[in-house]
Regions:
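Long, charged amphipathic helices and adjacent flexible linkers at domain junctions
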Residues: 124-130, 211, 215-224, 257-283, ...
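A conserved regulatory-domain signal marking ACT and ACT-like small-molecule sensing domains
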Residues: 2-13, 20-223
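Active-site neighborhood of HAD-like aspartate-dependent phosphohydrolases
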Residues: 222-268
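C-terminal cap/substrate-recognition subdomain and adjoining C-terminal extension
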Residues: 280-398, 402-452
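A short, highly charged, low-complexity intrinsically disordered segment
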Residues: 6, 11-22, 29-35, 238-239, ...
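Short glycine/serine/threonine-rich phosphate/pyrophosphate-binding segments
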Residues: 62-63, 150-152, 234-237, 389-392
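Conserved active-site and cofactor/substrate-binding residues in soluble primary-metabolism enzymes
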Residues: 57, 61, 100, 104, ...
Length: 452
């Protein structure tokens, strides 16, 4: 299949099926909300609805003692949650308790757990909801650092738009601080919450942390393919500028590149103009540049982690395949597509061979790679930095702008502005703890001291 090919009827049907399933999931959400009831509706007759909360220092045996005491009063459990944060335990149970046993159960819990230094609260309320609120969205906040002021401002913005924070937990302490917030947004319909998204985008630029928000649910965990731009995304350089340096025309080429990435010039025309500057260079220069490439910090970790999870990973670049192929082999990527420099008699001619990999071709390449691997577009992720990546990010299920030009940030689903590629993992809900556990098991774990 070439970049201009279109999906088959079976592929189109699969896409329609996915859309139907997504609609059904949305309808199911509303149906669940309609049938949500109180604890009093869910427990047997003669039982009082109670929310039992225990807090204090975490010690071995606390949980066992808690449930042993509840079991002696034949308590009916509806929901339980326990968490430990820096040595402090919080344990809560939503339960049905025989009315005549409420006082003795409370006294028994306090007597038993006071020896562990735990406090006990029992709230009896027939109007307690029997089911947890179902979060509609997930927000990831990334910064270096993230401060209380940042979270206060984010929380106030959410409150101003009627959104509620259901939970917060840390997902990263290196190389950035990352927090994941589960939210309930009033308008949870597809396409809803647009004013909130705009307000958060403005807040991001004002306070200097990255904020990404997407719908909660299975689709967030269903991603199976990731496609990276190369120059200034997967690697730290613009390859054509590295080549131009050997021709003594780096500044001239860099100026054209900058205008093209901002969307001020047609990419294909600008590419031809820049490649002309390379005419006459010895082909060995291409190999030298390939050896000099430096990956963006976090690139190896990101690709290694996603490959462990079964992702297909690859690159689509407006750069040159002769430089990218060695990198793709080293990183064990599943696909790579880029322009081909014409070389005649060991010299660059100043031309490229075949169709230019431009904005449209990048998006078509993503589609082709997805279809060839049996992966639907809503299961894809694309990461890029320039106007040339707009169509690719718009096509992907999740488009991530990485230290990007404004034109790309405006259309991306999420934007990150720290030069560390493993932020992509945090946006996908993968925690630093999970990454490093896997690295420890296979001997690849390392933390490089951060500067600045």
């Amino acid at each position: 299949m070439n970049p201009e090919s279109t999906p088959s009827s079976s592929q189109t049907a699969a896409t329609e099926t996915a859309a139907t399933q997504t609609a059904a999931e949305t309808q199911g959400l509303h149906a669940d909300e309609e049938f949500a009831g109180t604890v009093a509706d869910a427990i047997g007759e003669g039982l009082a609805p109670a929310l039992i909360t225990v807090t204090g220092p975490d010690r071995p045996g606390v949980t066992a003692a808690f449930f042993r005491m509840l079991s002696s009063y034949s308590v009916q459990l509806l929901d339980v949650e326990q968490s430990i944060f820096r040595g402090n335990l919080s344990l809560a149970a939503l339960a049905g308790v025989e009315k005549e046993n409420l006082d003795s159960m409370r006294d028994g819990l306090q007597a038993t757990l006071s020896s562990y230094g735990m406090g006990v609260q029992v709230q009896v309320d027939r109007d307690l909801e029997s089911t947890r609120p179902r979060s509609t969205h997930v927000m990831v906040v990334i910064g270096r650092p993230v401060t209380a002021v940042h979270i206060s401002q984010i929380g106030q913005t959410l409150a101003d738009y009627g959104a509620n924070i259901d939970s917060i937990h840390g997902i990263a302490d290196y190389p950035v601080t990352g927090l994941e917030l589960e939210l309930t947004v009033p308008d949870a319909s597809p396409g809803g919450g647009v004013p909130l998204r705009k307000a958060l985008a403005e807040l991001t630029s004002d306070i200097g942390v990255d904020i990404a928000i997407e719908r909660a649910g299975l689709s967030r965990r269903a991603k199976r393919l990731i496609c990276f731009d190369v120059d200034s995304t997967l690697i730290q350089h613009e390859v054509i500028e590295m080549l131009a340096a050997y021709a003594g025309r780096e500044d001239e080429v860099a100026a054209v590149t900058e205008r093209a990435m901002r969307g001020e010039l047609d990419f294909a025309e600008s590419l031809h103009e820049r490649v002309k500057a390379l005419a006459g260079l010895d082909a060995s220069v291409v190999d030298k540049v390939a050896r000099d490439i430096k990956l963006t910090p976090g690139a190896r970790t990101t690709i290694r982690t996603l490959k462990r999870l079964g992702y297909k990973a690859g690159v689509v670049s407006g750069g040159f395949i002769q430089v990218i192929e060695p990198l793709a082999r080293e990183l064990e990527l599943d696909f790579a597509r880029a322009n081909t420099l014409e070389i005649v008699d060991g010299k660059l001619t100043g031309r490229v061979i075949g169709p230019v990999i431009d904005r449209k071709a990048k998006a078509e390449s993503l589609k082709e790679f997805a279809w060839s691997n049996g992966i639907q577009l809503h299961q894809t992720v694309a990461v890029g930095d320039g106007a040339n990546d707009i169509d690719m990010l718009s096509t992907a299920g999740l488009g991530i702008a990485f230290n990007a030009k404004p034109a790309l940030q405006e259309v991306a689903d999420a934007s990150v502005n720290h030069p560390l590629l493993d932020q992509v993992l945090f946006l996908l809900g993968i925690s630093r703890h999970e990454i490093e556990d896997a690295d420890l098991r296979d001997g690849t774990y390392r933390r490089v001291p951060l500067r600045g």
